[in-house]
Amino acid sequence: MPAARVGSAVVTGHACDAATTIAGPGATTVLIEGVPAARLGDLTTPHLAGIPPICSMHTMPIIGPGCPTVIVQGQPISKVGDNVDAGTITSGATTVLVCGS
């Protein structure tokens, strides 16, 4: 699967904001197409969660499963299809494939 990086798209699974991106911090020592690699535990950009009209800002951590064979700064690298709270990472770097894809 394509490796995720800071700025990769995330479908949130929330009614208030359907989409967000990975905010990071990412792995500043591992750049994918010039952008820090995303890892398990990195956060999304703040976005609205809840059911309209009751919405509140929050962030979500990447919860995986990640790629256990590619460790970046002590954490598994994240990839398209990984879970993010109620959502999923939907975009990544097509030039960097991880976990046998």
Predicted regions: what is each one?
Residues 1-101:
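Intrinsically disordered, low-complexity proline/glycine-rich segments
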